[in-house]
Amino acid sequence: MDKKSARIRRATRARRKLKELGATRLVVHRTPRHIYAQVIAPNGSEVLVAASTVEKAIGEQLKYTGNKDAAAAVGKAVAERAIEKGITGVSFDRSGFQYHGRVQALADAAREAGLQF
């Protein structure tokens, strides 16, 4: 099993459990150059809020979009947008990525901005 298929297997298992809970989830996806975050409705069919380093407003503030500072900016932005829509509690879906580095920086920034998980 290669690295990508192992990550996808872990993500699928976690998403199955989150679906059983019926919780709104904060989904993170990372690439070497960018990081993306979305808040998805409990039914899984609707993206309620999204933020990423691809967005011009966030990308212009950063020197480089593939580091922990960029992840923290995305975490803060997604949390602020979620709170504006009345979403305060979510389940964190790390998409099979290790809870370390950029994924952890995004989660910590979202918590500091007021999102609870």
UniProtKB/Swiss-Prot annotation:
SUPFAM superfamilies named among the record's database cross-references: Translational machinery components
Signal sequence bounds: none
Record-linked InterPro entries: Ribosomal_uL18_bac-type (IPR004389), Ribosomal_uL18_bac/euk (IPR005484)
Gene Ontology biological-process annotations: translation
GO MF, any single term: structural constituent of ribosome
Domain of life: Bacteria
A Gene Ontology cellular-component term: cytosolic large ribosomal subunit
Keyword set, alphabetical order: Ribonucleoprotein, Ribosomal protein, RNA-binding, rRNA-binding
Family, per entry: Belongs to the universal ribosomal protein uL18 family.
Subunit structure: Part of the 50S ribosomal subunit; part of the 5S rRNA/L5/L18/L25 subcomplex. Contacts the 5S and 23S rRNAs.
Record's function text: This is one of the proteins that bind and probably mediate the attachment of the 5S RNA into the large ribosomal subunit, where it forms part of the central protuberance.
PANTHER family, per the entry: 39S RIBOSOMAL PROTEIN L18, MITOCHONDRIAL, LARGE RIBOSOMAL SUBUNIT PROTEIN UL18M
HAMAP family the UniProt entry points to: Ribosomal_uL18_B
Protein name per UniProt: Large ribosomal subunit protein uL18
Lineage summary: Bacteria, Pseudomonadati, Pseudomonadota, Gammaproteobacteria, Enterobacterales
